[in-house]
Every structure is written in C-alpha cells, then in structure tokens.
Amino acid sequence: MSLPRLAITAGEPAGIGPELLIRLAATSVAADLIAICDRALLERAAARCGLSVELVDDDGLALDQRLAGTLRVRHAALATMEVPGQPDPRNARYVLGTLTDAAEGCSSGHYDAVVTAPLQKSSINDAGIRFSGHTEFFAEYAHADVVMMLASPELRVALATTHLPLASVPAAITRVSLTRTLHIVHNELRAKFGIAQPRIAVLGINPHAGEGGHLGREEIDVVIPVLDELRDKGMILLGPLPADTAFVPRQREHYDAVVAMYHDQALPVLKSEAFDSTVNLTLGLPFIRTSVDHGTALDLAGTGRGDPASLIAAVNMALELVARRTSPPPAPPRGEGRDEGPTLAGTNG
C-alpha cells in the first residue's frame, strides 16, 4: 500500500522552516514527504543542523515505504540566497509560489495534504503584496469560506475572526458570518474528526459574555439569536460563555470544540498548555491543510537548534485526517438537538 503523499512547504527562507524540514526528514514518519522548496536551501539547512539527509527529486511515483533521512524535493528557485534571521522581500513571490504549487497539487489529487512551515507575513507585505496569512491565502485560492482551528490532544479552538485588529472585531462578527462559521465547524468536526453530534462551546465577545447587556450588546444582538436559530435546527451549542471560565478543566467534558470570537481570546490558553503539540488546520477547504503553531523564530534560524515537535504534530494530524477522509461522516444520534449546556459563571476579573 502506497504512503500518503504530503506536500511540505518550508515557509520563510530566512526563518526556521527549512531546518525543521530537515529534522522532520530525519525521523521515520510513515509518509511520502515532498518538500516544495529550493533544493540548495535545504542542503544549507542540513549542514547547519549537522544532519545527512538524502534529497531526491520528486518523480511523482508512489512510495510503499520511506527511509529515515530521505526527503523528496519539488524544486522551486529562490530569488536571492537567504541570510538566516534576515527575511528578504525579494523572496516573497518564491514563498507564495510554493503555496500555490501545494494548493494546485492537492486540488489535482497529486498530494493528499499540505503541511506548512511558518512564513514571515511582514516580508511579503514589504514586497508590496497584500497578505494576511496562510489561512486567507488558501481560502482565496479555493474560493472557499474557511475557519482557522487550532487543535491539541486536549482542546480544539476555532476562530470567528482571525488576523484583525481588536477594534475591528465587533463589526466583523455578524449574524451571517457567525452562522457560517458554526456551520463549517459543525460539519468539519463530523467529517474530519468523526464526531457524530458535535458539542460546540461559543464564547461571548465581551467580558462575562456581556453581563446581560451591561458590558456590551453584541451577545444580545448577534450571538444569542444565531445560537437559538441553529439549536432549533439540531446543533448542540453551549453559550455564549464567558471566556474566563470556559476553559476550566472540569468544564471541557461538556464540549468537543470551542469557537472563540478573536485571535487572542483563546489561543493563549491553548499555547500555554500545549505549545509543541498544537496544530493549526484550516476547516472548509476542499483539501487538507495543517501547519505548525509557531512563527519563523528568526532568532534561532541558522543555529540548527530548532525543535521540530510542532511540525511533526502537524504531519501526524494530516495523516490522521487523510486516513479518516476515506470513511463516511458518522450519522448523528437520534433524539439530540437543542442543548444550551452548562451555565459557566464568570469571575469578578
């Protein structure tokens, strides 16, 4: 039986990504790893890591097994040689080209999934290219409505908004957008994670989930009407919950995933608990995409000391999703539907 084919993009050439790919290749992970990257960049990364990795041109043929210390490469040429720790905007189009190549390969079935290493958003924007992140790039490529989810072995968190200034968040969360987000999360928990009837905790926007309108009306005007409508259609939705108590360990048994309203509302909890094992994945795409949950670590680039744990976790999750993709979504159990879940008290914080 042939191994799943995973496209791996190396991200920012001056960052830690190329070295992480080399360290990944040194493991015995059971996948056909195809690095979409400049070949010489990988050779220099291997030298910095002090590792001997055999780089093989990707011929597109299926592999039944992969030896540790081997990595297939789909070469893409850098515009200019990297200087570790110093991103160069001249390489921005190279970086975006690797993402396009991966997306096209996944869409055609050439790859089973794409796993992305971190890139430097500021460098791409400095090149005059408007760029918000991987999630938005793949959404635009696929013309798809997507949701960013970060998942650890203990917790799954999806975001109603992603890379927005905090002041822009309330206006960005509308009944239409929140309904769309919850539909995507519900459907993908069933399809990708095999959860027959997902239980989704939805956080409020304001402290204490608005305190009955005394700390903001977004919950009353937007969140509660959406939750009520979707509960009537059979979804199990808890909330809106105050974010300060929603992550208390004893409460987690009541839900399968959390929908947070903005980037820094929930991710600090997740990253503080499971930084090395948290994976970023994009829900709603027609293909599987996972990623590390850390940045380019420019201070470590070139030292050979980068930890590949998050990249390995992203690869393992991609493999799990590929394996599960061949199974039909589970049928929801009968007799379940409207459930507002537990009442989680706020704090005086």
Q: Where would I find each of the regions flagged by the language model?
A:
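A glycine-rich helix N-cap at a beta->alpha junction
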Residues: D59, T135-A142
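Contiguous, glycine/small-aliphatic-enriched amphipathic segments in soluble metabolic enzymes
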Residues: M1-G133, V176-M261, Q265-I288, H294-P330, ...
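Conserved hydrophobic/aromatic beta-strand scaffold that supports enzyme active sites
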Residues: F137, M148, V157-L159, F287-R289
